């Protein structure tokens, strides 16, 4: 269980975090989103024990992270947004270096490294890290965060700047880690991935938490069910002069409605113009649309 109460962080008069409280369970993926400067990285560093909050409490599995951040280290895997790799080292030596820091034996390092290379589809072949693509470097950084088999992971922009295939691979791997029982806290600008893989999501705005919950809860709180009416019509000119606007999609005309009243208005106008409603789709706004709405 991870519990935070009234976390604040003041940097020389700038309030980077302002009274943030939340709670989520072990074995969940918890996403933190917000515009640039919202406080995401600051919160991740506090959760990781890298910086102390100005005030507030944080408990991770009964560890008081504020008073005893070192107690978290051996069970924490941290991935910063910019992972500075030792580019003259091979991936094998890089993982061995960190494995030794965590007290693993040479045999344990070799076994664990091979497991991670296989899981992450990495074939280092003795190449230096400076020769790796950005995607391979990010996978290596993730392997480094997992070398000591931690159960609690904090990832800052795990897929930032990667091509779609690498980004998708890492998102799928995070799902695998969850199935293995890992607890994951992450920030991301790829909101479609956050929506797809996170159990709970927090939205930060200027250091304040403005939303927290499952996607279902966020939709109920901030989302409005909208409708798309797909219709066919022989004489498109009959639509001219109506108060609604139309677009074309899938070979049909589409009228968008943001309420049941607008839905009834659209279907009535379509009927008056001699059109035929073929189907009606309904949906809640995406996480990206909610963030834009909340951020205004």
Model-derived features: where do they sit?
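Walker A (P-loop) phosphate-binding loop of ABC-type ATPase nucleotide-binding domains
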Residues: 35-39
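Helix-to-loop junction immediately C-terminal to a conserved catalytic motif
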Residues: 48
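Conserved ABC transporter NBD signature motif
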Residues: 56-67, 71-72
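Catalytic Walker B motif of ABC-type/P-loop ATPase nucleotide-binding domains
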Residues: 153-157
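ABC transporter nucleotide-binding domain
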Residues: 172-254
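Short, charged/small-residue-rich alpha-helical element at the C-terminal edge
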Residues: 225-296
